[in-house]
């Protein structure tokens, strides 16, 4: 979504909406695949009348068109403790995503994360606006404050799905990413240079997309996927027609068969229509 389907204002353009509807009218299944939690992903979608399945939290949660949860992959206690030990040792700030919300120990440090997200989406990052957004999340309960992340596992029914770590020291982030990647049960990706998105190894966009394709009896070679960042690579590498946004990272462009326009200029819609027009 961010950097791909959404523009800098976190909106889905009419061109993108119309292209998705056109694809659906041809019997094509369109799936949202995002690092966002469902309650974040569904907000911009609510401004449209689109009905689609969702791959959320990089594949940690899959929902059908009616929002029913079809599959989840969470981090067990041992993995959570290993992640926390590494991040705490390196003094790297992180948020914990669960099946019910996002947890923070220090909302003042969340500002850095959301400024980074804004920059990644092509915004300069209005500090006061982002502060207001953080407060809104706290007020509506999607961003929850805890004294200690250990308290989360004591809450009945709470499952830890993803850890989002952030640090402006890119060398440190890269080093930590390599250390975490060495843990076989973890998948480590990123949605910008300054962050790490840590999930269970079963929770990857590519794995979730393959599962959906198999359920629909669709060959992955007949699937098109679009993305802009490293958390899209597992998906783009699996499909027959990988598409990179013009604003994508070089590593993403390197594996694409097509480079479409930017997220600011409805690159998703343009790519969909290009492929469907060529098929005619």
Spell out what each predicted region is.
Residues 1-9, 83:
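Asp-based phosphoryl-transfer active-site loop
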Residues 5-7, 13, 45, 181, ...:
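Mg2+-dependent phosphoryl-transfer enzymes with acidic/Ser/Thr/Gly-rich catalytic loops
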Residues 14-124, 128:
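Active-site phosphate-binding/coordination module
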Residues 23, 34, 58, 163, ...:
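Residue-level signal for inorganic ion chemistry
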Residues 27-31, 51-52, 162, 221-222, ...:
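Short active-site oxyanion
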Residues 38-42, 172-174, 206, 232-233:
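Short, well-ordered alpha-helical microsegments
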Residues 90-92, 98-226:
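Conserved acidic, metal-coordinating active-site core of Asp-based
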């Amino acid at each position: 979504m961010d950097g791909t389907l959404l523009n800098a204002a976190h909106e889905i353009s009419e061109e993108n909406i119309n292209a998705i509807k056109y694809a659906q009218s041809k019997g094509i299944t369109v799936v949202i695949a995002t690092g966002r939690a469902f309650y974040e992903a569904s907000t911009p979608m609510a401004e449209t009348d689109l009905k689609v399945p969702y791959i959320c939290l990089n594949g940690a949660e899959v929902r059908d068109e009616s929002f029913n949860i079809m599959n989840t992959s969470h981090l067990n206690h041992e993995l959570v403790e290993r992640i926390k030990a590494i991040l705490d040792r390196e003094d790297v700030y992180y948020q914990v995503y669960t099946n019910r919300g996002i947890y923070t120990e220090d909302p003042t440090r969340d500002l850095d994360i959301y400024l980074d997200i804004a920059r990644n989406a092509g915004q300069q990052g209005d500090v006061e606006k982002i502060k207001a957004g953080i407060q809104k999340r706290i007020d509506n309960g999607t961003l929850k404050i805890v004294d200690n992340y250990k308290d989360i596992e004591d809450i009945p029914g709470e499952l830890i799905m993803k850890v989002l770590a952030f640090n402006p020291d890119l060398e440190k982030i890269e080093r930590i990413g390599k250390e975490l990647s060495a843990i076989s049960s973890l998948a480590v990706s990123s949605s910008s240079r300054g962050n790490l998105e840590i999930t269970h190894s079963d929770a990857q966009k590519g794995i979730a997309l393959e599962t959906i394709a198999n359920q629909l009896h669709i060959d992955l070679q007949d699937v098109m996927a679009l993305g802009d960042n490293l958390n899209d690579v597992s998906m783009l590498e699996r499909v027959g027609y990988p598409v990179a946004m013009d604003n994508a990272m070089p590593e993403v462009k390197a594996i694409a068969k097509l480079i479409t326009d930017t997220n600011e200029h409805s690159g998703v819609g343009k790519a969909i229509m290009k492929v469907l027009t060529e098929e005619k």
